[in-house]
Amino acid sequence: MKNPFVIKAYESRELFCDRNDELQLMLRNCINHTDMTLISQRRIGKTGLILRLFDEIATVHPDIHTIYVDIFSSRNIDDFIKLLAEAIMKAFKPKTTLGEKLMAFIKTMRPQLTFDNITGEPQLMIAYQSPHEKEYTLRGLLDFLDSQSIHIIIAIDEFQQIRDYPEANMEALLRTYIQQTRNLTFIYCGSNKHLMADIFTNEKKPFYSSTAFVSLGKISTESYATFIRRLFNECGREIDDDSIAFILDWTRRHTYYTQQLCHTIFANGDLQTDISKVKTACEQLMQQGEAVYLQYRQMLTIKQWNYLIAVAKEGSVSQITAAQFLGRHKIGSASTSQRLADALCEKGLLNDDINVKGVTYSVNDVFLSHWLERL
């Protein structure tokens, strides 16, 4: 029996939990040609929501076409163009009218076209004579799509990667080309919320105030509990209410970790799940991650490691400069605490959640947090 608790981005709407409000908001934005920036902490389900949105669009608005491109692996404008072109080719199959037009256009770039041995997906290699030719190719791709007189949604995942490109003008270049299109709608998302926020909220940057923001929080306890119970029951298995409550509390309703724990519980094969079975799965997950967690210890200073433990033992900390927190964990001064928190946020080990009451810090990896609590 296939495990219904998906730990990759998206499989089907039946195996996707809630997000109905966010889905409808994004759908309205797409229909009305409103570009969006999706902001949330890591592993909360941004990519899954985008793919769920595309699934919905294919059903209710089949005249709208969708393209998804993940640029996490990109290092420069060359890689960006390559990944975008490959994503476009994947979206528009060669035997369709638009696909044939696309292939004719791609050939004008004089590419070396190969196919992945495993997936069969097209892979491009494009040789450029000058930086100007790269810019011309990027603009040409967007102009080609825009000229088809059909509505196309382009989702760019890990968009903050453009900040690491050696081409200092990449943001300005993209913004200039994108704002001239009429039939393209863009969705930007990324796992580094600080860089994403700076790209879109810094008034000195090209993308400032160019999109609507969609904030992705945690799924409600009620929705997730109903979802978990349904998937177990549909597969002929039982799970009691106390077990579900423990799962949601232990994973802090963080999408990736909730899915991972439920996936592990289901994989263990018990027809009836109680809290003891849930705790067994929790132990398995922490043991599986232990080798990685010990590597973190090697890459951090002693003070940083001890600070990470302190935050884990607290669960979350909203006043990292408070005397009580500093004294309880022998951290030192308030400035030391802030410096350590900033360093660990920069390394991606701490999450700083900004809310109306201030900033709350927690360990990014929920399983790591529970493992650290024991030290």
Model-derived features with residue positions:
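C-terminal leucine-rich, beta-strand-based interaction scaffolds used for sensing/assembly
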Residues: 2-5, 287, 291-375
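Alpha-helical DNA-recognition elements
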Residues: 56, 173, 264, 343-347
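Conserved Walker B catalytic segment
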Residues: 35, 124-192, 201
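Conserved AAA+ ATPase "SRH/arginine-finger" region at the nucleotide-binding site
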Residues: 212-223
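A short, basic N-terminal segment
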Residues: 1-41, 56-60, 351
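P-loop NTPase nucleotide-binding core
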Residues: 40-44, 48-153
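Short regulatory helix/loop adjacent to the ATP-binding pocket of P-loop NTPases
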Residues: 193-211
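Amphipathic alpha-helical "lid/sensor" segments that cap RecA-like P-loop NTPase cores
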Residues: 225, 229-292, 302
